[in-house]
Amino acid sequence: MVSSNFYKNLGPRKLTAIIDFLHDIIAPPKIHEDIAIHDIKILQEASPNDISFLSNPKYSEFLKTTKAAACIVPKNFTGEANPNTVLLHAQNSYFAYSKLIDFFYAPIKSYPTKIMKSAIVADSATIGKNCYIGHNVVIEDDVIIGDNSIIEAGSFIGRGVNIGRNARIEQHVSINYAIIGDDVVILAGAKIGQDGFGFSTEKGVHHKIFHIGIVKIGNNVEIGANTTIDRGSLQDTIIKDLCRIDNLVQIGHGVKIGKGSIIVAQTGIAGSSTIGKYCALGGQVGIAGHLNIGDGAQVAAQGGVAQNIEAGKIVGGSPAIPIMDWHRQSIIMKQLLKTSNSKLKK
């Protein structure tokens, strides 16, 4: 349930206005102009004043019983629905839903153009126009922060860091040795630019390697809460434009992640590995060091990758193998287990 403590409902909205806002909607030819939509709800909870959406076919059964006034469905949806629910067909129903959220809701929390008194900002730092610097933020020498950026309470921006325009840095983020592009979001507790896990061993002693690389983050990147991105030991750690990195991800020193890649929670990428463009790594994936994951490759959740992956391939399991082989192995293991259990009973 959406709480009015945190978000302002901008409704009601006319259904015709919603259709115009979403642009690519295929709607019935005649819709009553006075239909008012007050809120967005899931199918099971929607009332006659609400709009809903369907993106996962396993929830299509709820369309028969929903009370929603309207529902956004996939373009090719032909299933049954409550005759009182107006179906709005979209090329991408989940994307349409994400746009609809912006149309209906705005956060109550606002950020004035202000540097709070408790913030410590070095004289040599450059703060752009229309920025908010929150309570107890520390910004060291020679930092550059672009226009319209937000740095929330308790964050630390180390010497020489460069952050682009329209950044949103949430609470208790630590950034060192980094150059960050425009329109970047970094969620609470993330740590960027610390030493990587690099040691040379001599006569039984592990000697720390001085890391002289940095972290480079492109434009329009989102980094999740409590994620850690180490700076390179010699080569830089690089996160390209449009990447989405979930919470609790560890990215080792010198890793390169290509444009538009998605990395899900609790994944770990060891040092000097390269992830191509538009790759997808599921939850709890492990990538060994010095590997190359080709463009568009996908790794299923909990996959353990110990070898290079060709572009476009989908793998799973540990050690990771082609996804269909992994499925076959799982089926065979179940069959062997049944056979073994049958023999034991005899």
UniProtKB/Swiss-Prot annotation:
<dbReference type="Pfam" id="PF04613">
    <property type="entry name" value="LpxD"/>
</dbReference>
<comment type="subunit">
    <text>Homotrimer.</text>
</comment>
<keyword id="KW-0444">Lipid biosynthesis</keyword>
<dbReference type="InterPro" id="IPR020573">
    <property type="entry name" value="UDP_GlcNAc_AcTrfase_non-rep"/>
</dbReference>
<dbReference type="Pfam" id="PF00132">
    <property type="entry name" value="Hexapep"/>
</dbReference>
<keyword id="KW-0012">Acyltransferase</keyword>
<dbReference type="InterPro" id="IPR001451">
    <property type="entry name" value="Hexapep"/>
</dbReference>
<keyword id="KW-0808">Transferase</keyword>
<comment type="function">
    <text>Catalyzes the N-acylation of UDP-3-O-acylglucosamine using 3-hydroxyacyl-ACP as the acyl donor. Is involved in the biosynthesis of lipid A, a phosphorylated glycolipid that anchors the lipopolysaccharide to the outer membrane of the cell.</text>
</comment>
<dbReference type="GO" id="GO:0009245">
    <property type="term" value="P:lipid A biosynthetic process"/>
</dbReference>
<dbReference type="InterPro" id="IPR007691">
    <property type="entry name" value="LpxD"/>
</dbReference>
<dbReference type="GO" id="GO:0016410">
    <property type="term" value="F:N-acyltransferase activity"/>
</dbReference>
<keyword id="KW-0677">Repeat</keyword>
<comment type="similarity">
    <text>Belongs to the transferase hexapeptide repeat family. LpxD subfamily.</text>
</comment>
<keyword id="KW-0441">Lipid A biosynthesis</keyword>
<keyword id="KW-0443">Lipid metabolism</keyword>
<dbReference type="InterPro" id="IPR011004">
    <property type="entry name" value="Trimer_LpxA-like_sf"/>
</dbReference>
<dbReference type="InterPro" id="IPR018357">
    <property type="entry name" value="Hexapep_transf_CS"/>
</dbReference>
<feature type="active site" description="Proton acceptor">
    <location>
        <position position="253"/>
    </location>
</feature>
<comment type="pathway">
    <text>Bacterial outer membrane biogenesis; LPS lipid A biosynthesis.</text>
</comment>
<dbReference type="GO" id="GO:0016020">
    <property type="term" value="C:membrane"/>
</dbReference>
<protein>
    <recommendedName>
        <fullName>UDP-3-O-acylglucosamine N-acyltransferase</fullName>
        <ecNumber>2.3.1.191</ecNumber>
    </recommendedName>
</protein>
